[in-house]
Amino acid sequence: IVVTGTNGKTTSCRILEEGLKKAGKSYFINKSGANLITGVTASFIMNSTITGKCKKDYAIIECDENAFKEVSRYIHCDVILVTNVFRDQLDRYGEVTHTLNAIKESVKNLPNAIVCLDADCSLTYSMSKEIPNKIITFGVNVPFDKNAKAPEISDAKYCIFCKHEYDYTYHTYGHLGGFGCPNCGYKRPQPDFAVESVEEMKNDHSVVVANLNGDRNIIRVNIGGAYNIYNAIGCAAALTAFGIDEKTVIDAIEHFNGAFGRMEHFKAGDNTVNLILVKNPAGFSQTMNFLKNI
């Protein structure tokens, strides 16, 4: 399983790891977050015999969006989870279309993989029109904040196909939400795996009602933050595509442990410290929204 995209890779890998562990699978993961070609290669070496035979049956690989082009040439992949595409690391990637094209070209090297795409991201979902792979979609059917207005800054304000401005029925965060182009008709699909309502959002968890490919479930996401609801539903899609049963999928989401710096909480004297890693404008904005509600 390969996880790529701008935000959510490391946390998603933690959920996937919990799912494979609970399912009794033999696997390894590049847990240190070394997600360039050198780090991915080192992970395979560390989990292989001296003659090059892998000691495990499966791998969960976090992969940098740009490095995926090279990595995809050397691996067999069952499932690819693309979390989202946002403006990020402009010194490396330039505009968001560069990141999108890098992922798209990488996926084309793995035509037999099932690809899980964020239906709420107009950039990410656009790949479904240009790749031969089987597609599974995930998303959030409702806004996290019913009073939320359109974001002042959007990484995808205009249709990727015809350049007309999108209309939105609702926003979740950034450019994610119920997008639709009134000119060419490109729009958000109804996701295969969808959060239908958000019942509770706390500092350390969220409770959602989710439709997992037709089955409605109440799920407690074992980490706070709106964007981690996306990570959870994306992993539900990826684990199901991998063949993990629904009960184990839900169990993984409800009991996984977060990664270093990802909504990490610890005590400093009598105070609780929240350690939250941010790397780009979209992530920073969501972190500010989270902190103002604590």
Spell out what each predicted region is:
Residues I1-G139, N147-A150, S154-Y158:
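Phosphate-binding loop of NTP-binding sites
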Residues T10-G19, E199-D215:
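Acidic-glycine-rich active-site phosphate/pyrophosphate-binding loop
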Residues L16, L20, V40-F44, A232-F242, ...:
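Buried hydrophobic packing segments
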Residues S26-K31, I218-A226, T272-N274:
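A short glycine/serine-rich beta->alpha loop
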Residues Y74-N84, L176-Q190, R220-E254:
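A conserved, hydrophobic alpha-helical segment in the catalytic core
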Residues V140-D204, N222:
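Cys/His-rich short segments
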Residues Y186, M201-N203, A238-V278:
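Gly/charged, well-structured mid-domain segments that form the phosphate/adenylate-handling core
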Residues A259, L277-I294:
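Active-site beta-alpha connecting loops in nucleotide-dependent enzymes
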